[in-house]
Amino acid sequence: MAKAKFERTKPHVNIGTIGHIDHGKTTLTAAITKVLHDKYPDLNPFTPFEDIDKAPEERERGITISISHVEYQTESRHYAHVDCPGHADYVKNMITGAAQMDGAILVVAATDGPMPQTKEHVLLARQVGVPYIVVALNKSDMVDDEEIFDLVELEVRELLNEYEFPGDEVPVIRVSALKALEGDPEWGKKILELMEAVDQNIPEPQRDIDKPFLMPIEDVFSITGRGTVVTGRIERGVINVNDTVEIVGLKDDKITTTVTGVEMFRKLLDQGQAGDNVGLLLRGVKREEVERGQVVIKPGTTTPHTEFEAQVVILSKDEGGRHTPFFNNYRPQFYFRTTDVTGVVTLPEGTEMVMPGDNTSMTVKLIQPVAMEEGLKFAIREGGRTVGAGRVTKIIK
């Protein structure tokens, strides 16, 4: 009996299953938990298909998404795995990032090959920045012709190349989720082979704390005799007393200053790090020079922009969204991090209007610059009510 010890130090990676409906995403998810449970019973509970299939609903930025989370461990890693029952749930999850993915297992039925949703999921993975993909060629027990395997594999690799994934290098593993779930030892081995490919081909993500410092400003105070304090939750990186920072966004000029104090729960710290709610005391900055919605950053690491392309999902009427479609030149507010900025929407060519419940790409021109990079999430609001959510896919200027 192989024993792997549970270590909190194991690297943690977030993955998910993507692919066309009925190609076996949920069955594969269940099969992975079963095979890993059989191999390392003290580390892994088995999660049956039924439990994954009745995914609980979550609300992310007002959007209702059905999503299942399972956890499991290989010898070297701890995984959190997301699976969504419906195609619409996948699209919503990938755009809102309700469950962030460091990599994905693309499930393609060997009996069908790539189908329309396979394409859509790969395109979305590219647009929302899922960085790595491993392919599971499912239902391989139902194909006995080597030529069919070769053909399907070729199609999948071409599809990945088309969307700028390294299609020629991506591992393609032949599996039968159903047979593995039924306890067939040979097909069980193929699931372990798949997980080995995931271990080796989906790199550990960079932790938030290792990224360059960024803190969105939520509030600004003036403390007599000490200066100006900005408060917020550190999004990434670390900040030390006496670090030089820039304050950018909403205005044309940036401010460069020094952090003379870091406070948390009224205690002075030497350092604040990702996840901490802190107050930063800024040298020589007047209260009226900074405002909510700007960001404090490590100098030169983020720039403000006004024009970008985005992928968005629009709330349906039932989710509390709009009741009517919107058209070109729609002017809602875009809520980035801590503040709303009005923007003008240009719809893609050939799209006349967008209905509640749709997802679409769009170009947005903001009336004030916002510090952003590709992948940044935002909400679309009308008078404080969320009507959609999206993320930046490309910065124009």
UniProtKB/Swiss-Prot annotation:
Subcellular location(s) of the protein: Cytoplasm
Annotated spans, G2: 62-66
Keyword vocabulary terms for this entry: Cytoplasm, Elongation factor, GTP-binding, Hydrolase, Magnesium, Metal-binding, Nucleotide-binding, Protein biosynthesis
Residues bound to Mg(2+): T26
Main location: cytoplasm
Molecular function GO labels: GTP binding; GTPase activity; translation elongation factor activity
NCBIfam families referenced in this protein's UniProt entry, alphabetically: EF-Tu, PRK00049.1, PRK12735.1, PRK12736.1, small_GTP
Protein name from the UniProt record: Elongation factor Tu
Species this chain originates from: Thermobifida fusca (strain YX)
